[in-house]
């Protein structure tokens, strides 16, 4: 496999002159059974939610964490720092192995992300028809970018009234995510728009 050339230039965006507001912290307890990858872990994390971050976005970050979990995967600063992703996996020598975005970034953002890492993944959510028609054709040639859509109906249920201590039992089988919380079990069937889980 050839070396992937990494571009370390910052993302070209204007910086806000306003002082950052404090984030809200959440406790996340994950009991993970990933039958597809043979991963069985119980993990506890403290999650910072940016003041402008919706419950839906934070929920998708948690889904991404469970779906691509490994010991090196961690949450980035995301909304508070455009030069970091929602999540990333780094090597011991600080190379970015896997860059994970959530939401509806434009093609320029995904292209920029793909140049900083060996692999880029996106969990998209929300009203995707216009975004998909514009962005997916523009990134089809990016071989290290994989994009999946989270179904909005189940996301609405998972994200509603998110408690400060979040406890999920997650089973992943044949690419489907089954999340059990204090309200029952929820099936998250991702729709792959380009690429695959990897």
Explain the meaning of each model-derived region:
Residues 107-110, 193-198:
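Short, surface-exposed linear segments at secondary-structure transitions and domain or protein termini
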Residues 21-48, 119-123, 127-196:
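Helix-rich interaction surfaces within compact, conserved domain-sized segments
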Residues 110-114, 127:
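Short Lys/Arg-rich amphipathic alpha-helical segments
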Residues 87-89, 94-109:
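Conserved catalytic cores of phosphodiester-cleaving nucleases, focusing on short active-site segments
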Residues 34-79:
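Acidic-basic catalytic patches of nuclease active cores, encompassing PD-(D/E)XK
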Residues 1-18:
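N-terminal amphipathic/basic-hydrophobic helices that include classical n-h-c signal peptides
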């Amino acid at each position: 496999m050839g070396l992937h050339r990494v571009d370390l230039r910052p993302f070209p965006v204007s910086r806000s002159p306003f002082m950052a507001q404090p984030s809200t912290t959440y406790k996340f307890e994950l009991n993970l059974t990933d039958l597809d990858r043979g991963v069985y872990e119980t993990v506890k994390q403290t999650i910072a939610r940016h003041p402008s971050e919706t419950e839906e976005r934070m929920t998708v970050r948690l889904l991404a964490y469970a779906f691509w979990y490994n010991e090196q995967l961690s949450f980035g600063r995301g909304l508070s720092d455009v030069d970091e992703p929602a999540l990333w996996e780094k090597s011991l020598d600080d190379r970015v192995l896997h860059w994970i975005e959530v939401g509806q970034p434009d093609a320029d953002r995904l292209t920029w992300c793909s140049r900083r890492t060996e692999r880029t993944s996106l969990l998209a959510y929300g009203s995707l028809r216009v975004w998909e028609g514009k962005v997916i054709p523009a990134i089809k040639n990016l071989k290290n970018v994989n994009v999946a859509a989270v179904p909005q109906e189940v996301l609405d249920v998972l994200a509603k009234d998110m408690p400060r201590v979040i406890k999920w039992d997650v089973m992943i089988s044949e690419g489907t995510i089954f999340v059990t919380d204090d309200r029952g079990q929820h099936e998250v069937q991702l729709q792959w728009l380009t690429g695959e889980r990897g």
